[in-house]
Amino acid sequence: MSTFPWLTTIILFPIVAALAIPFIPDPTGKGRPIRWYALAVGLIDFALIVYAFTNFYDLNTPGMQLWESYDWIPEIGLRWSVGADGLSMPLILLTGFITTLAILAAWPVTLKPRLFYFLMLAMYGGQIAVFAVQDMLVFFLAWELELIPVYLLLAIWGGHKRQYAATKFILYTAGSSLFILVAGLAMAFYGDTVSFDMQTLAAKDYALGFQLLVYAGFLVAYGVKLPIVPLHTWLPDAHGEATAPVHMLLAGILLKMGGYALIRMNVDMLPAAHAKFAPVLVILGVVNIIYAALTSYAQRNLKRKIAYSSISHIGFVLIGIASFTNLGMSGAVLQMVSHGLIGASLFFLVGATYDRTHTLILEEMGGVGQKMKKIFAMFTACSLASLALPGMSGFVAELMVFIGFATSDAYSLPFRVIVVFLAAVGVILTPIYLLSMLREIFYGPENKELVEHEALVDAEPREVFIIACLLVPIIGIGLYPKLLTQIYDATTGQVIARAREVLPTLAQQTEQPLGILPMVAPQLKANAQ
């Protein structure tokens, strides 16, 4: 055990380091020293995360570790409380890893480099804070902090419709954040004790009706960030206009904040309401998988195609969260990490392809594989990971969710069969739209004007290095999932145990959770008996 404030240092270091960027000399005005400085800050902070994890984190302890708690504004009961458990630690590691690679991916950025890297580093600290803080009010502040850098990164460095995409992003995400504030305040002031501490909030005995209202508010807020259909429409627009490093942060980290908060607050703090809403999450998960897969197939814009593919894979996170099994929940967390790695790699390659072809329309591409053999090979490998090829992380995550839900005793057999069948249809659709995408980009029909253009060059060493760094954990987790699952199994097991405690009680209280899915009620009633 260490008394050093590791998490506070990890959160504040990139933010404080960003404040020094205006004072870094840049004789050429192209940002070269600023790039190296930002990369050094990213590497140092990631090294601190890895050091704290390897030396002071116990894999067998389900509760909070690396705990710190200090009075901040005692007049309103606000404390700076941070900690990491099995749910937050994998995502903190993912944040450090993806952000450092995103800084390296931003090497070609020459427009306002000081502001760009300042925002990247500020976002770095804000995202880690979301996963680490254990005070509801500070969580809300951290959640809001990361919105500002993303908005500016879209609005200044985005594509032709960047203002529209940035405005839509801020309206959706900032508007939905109000639900977090209202629901969090309601929990804090419920009962005789007023507290923003998450552990205190989780221990309160809330009335079922109150839980349902708060759960619904959180679900809207986190459903926008995940995103869940129909709250997803901001994401294709944001991805459609973002640059490659911003893509990596959006797909790799930002969306995971929604999944993390859904487990942390909806499942762990409001288990009775979760048992009621779980069938709804399952249905929303299936809708995500099928709808987004079909929409992805219909897209002719490469960025939007990958964006909808990303939304489709989020459906497995929802099904795993609602499975009420250790295996299903473990698969959901694994899918979040896998989705972050694969999504970041695909969007980086989309950006690399666009930098050379200057088009995102599939009909305008064709035959570029003969000039870009390395990019073709990397794009193929990452697409195979996305379609859940055995031996890669996506396969293990989706298989765990399938088995976890199929063996769940919280749902009737007919309902489980229907859900598994529909989810399997989504799995079948994935290779259809991804492999056809690869064919249209790299095989043909050949666009001779594009293929013969001198700007159409293959990947440089920096780009190969970034994809290699992403493929190593994708393949490593796919071959040996315990590399990741051992970090969070103790915590997710505790979360599921708490969620399952209320199933018999709810079965006695009602025959039809939320008045829907009568097929779910008989199994819940059987559990009660």
UniProtKB/Swiss-Prot annotation:
Membrane topology: Multi-pass membrane protein
Compartment list: Cellular thylakoid membrane
Catalysis performed (reactions): a plastoquinone + NADH + (n+1) H(+)(in) = a plastoquinol + NAD(+) + n H(+)(out); a plastoquinone + NADPH + (n+1) H(+)(in) = a plastoquinol + NADP(+) + n H(+)(out)
Subcellular location, principal: membrane
Keyword tRNA processing: no
Top class in the EC scheme: translocase
Transmembrane intervals: 4-24, 36-56, 91-111, 115-135, 137-157, 169-189, 209-229, 243-263, 277-297, 314-334, 335-355, 387-407, 417-437
GO biological process: ATP synthesis coupled electron transport; electron transport coupled proton transport
Gene Ontology CC: plasma membrane-derived thylakoid membrane
EC code(s) of this entry: 7.1.1.-
Coiled coil start-end: none
Domain of life: Bacteria
InterPro entries: NADH_Q_OxRdtase_chain4, NADH_Q_OxRdtase_chainM/4, NADH_UbQ_OxRdtase, ND/Mrp_TM
Gene Ontology terms for molecular function: NADH dehydrogenase (ubiquinone) activity; ubiquinone binding
Keywords: Membrane, NAD, NADP, Plastoquinone, Quinone, Thylakoid, Translocase, Transmembrane, Transmembrane helix
PANTHER family: NAD(P)H-QUINONE OXIDOREDUCTASE CHAIN 4, CHLOROPLASTIC, NADH-UBIQUINONE OXIDOREDUCTASE CHAIN 4
Family stated for the protein in its record: Belongs to the complex I subunit 4 family.
Function summary: NDH-1 shuttles electrons from NAD(P)H, via FMN and iron-sulfur (Fe-S) centers, to quinones in the respiratory chain. The immediate electron acceptor for the enzyme in this species is believed to be plastoquinone. Couples the redox reaction to proton translocation (for every two electrons transferred, four hydrogen ions are translocated across the cytoplasmic membrane), and thus conserves the redox energy in a proton gradient.
UniProt name for this protein: NAD(P)H-quinone oxidoreductase chain 4 1
Organism the protein comes from: Thermosynechococcus vestitus (strain NIES-2133 / IAM M-273 / BP-1)
Source species taxonomy: Bacteria, Bacillati, Cyanobacteriota, Cyanophyceae, Acaryochloridales
